Every structure is written in structure tokens, then in C-alpha cells.
């Protein structure tokens, strides 16, 4: 597993190998204040994600949450100028919800389970604040199509006004999903939204 150096990653989408905003994010609008990914989406990480989401290995939720939480703790410690307060100033953990079709296929919301473990280990309250509209699978879509698909896809159903939100997802591919969810939270009044993911697709 290739962990991402928090001092050398894109602050907008978590992309590794550079202490500046990446090419994809330069000039692009996002409502994420900061974003961190724990690891590069490579062979071992991909196998973990597939085993958890589609292989029925729900026990992996606790381990994924542990790795994500460890990355956030490390980022606060090693890159305080970039990620200071990522955990300690967060008011609530909010997860990016699964689509209706994914929920039916798997029988559970994979991010809700991870969020419960992460919330329990960090003592940051869990807020099940987002609902996903639409049911299309984005795995085969490019950046532009993902952005178009994600616009208006999320509805905030619990109060978030004035809150600092730690928004979590399993894998960032283009950042469109995280950005759209963050946008919904900001429109609903969240004061600050940081993103945290298990992995970032790269290359």
C-alpha cells in the first residue's frame, strides 16, 4: 500500500506527488476547503475496496476507517500548515451515500459502515446528512461526465448550518463526487467542509 505524503499532495483533491494544486484542479471550482486521501489506489488497495464493497467482506470497514483516521492524524502532525485541525476542529463526520442501485446490489451502504467506525474511533459525531438522488454508476465515466452527473445529486436532510464537516468517501477518482457533496453542504450552511478518502486514483 502506497501511502500519500500529506505535505506533497493536492490540497483540493488529494492527488499525490506534488505540494501544489494539481493540473486537474487548477482553475476548477470546488466547495471543498481541503482534501486528503490516505493511499494511492493501486493493486492492493483496489483489492481491499473490491473485497469490501462487492465481496461481502464487511469486516474490512474497521480497517479502512483505521487507515483513513491514521492518515488524518499524520496530516495534522506532519503538515499542520495544510491540514491543521482536520480532525480536532471537525463538528461532524458526514459520509457520501451510496446510490440506490448500489445499496440494492450490496445490501448495505459501504460508507455508512466506515463512517460509524471512524466516528467511534475519533469521537467526532456522525451525521447522516446527505441523500443521493439518481442511481447511475459513475465508475466508467470521465471527469466531465462525472461533474455533470454529480451536479445537484445530493440533498442535505439534517441541519449543518455553521458546522465544520469532515466529509468522507472511499475512493476519489476525479473529485467530482466529493465536490458536489461539499457544494450541497455549503449551500445548506456548513461553514467549512474538509474531504477525507481512503484512496485516490492516480495515473
Task: Tell what function each PLM region has.
Residues 1-203:
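Glycine-rich phosphate/pyrophosphate-handling loop used in enzymes and phosphotransfer proteins
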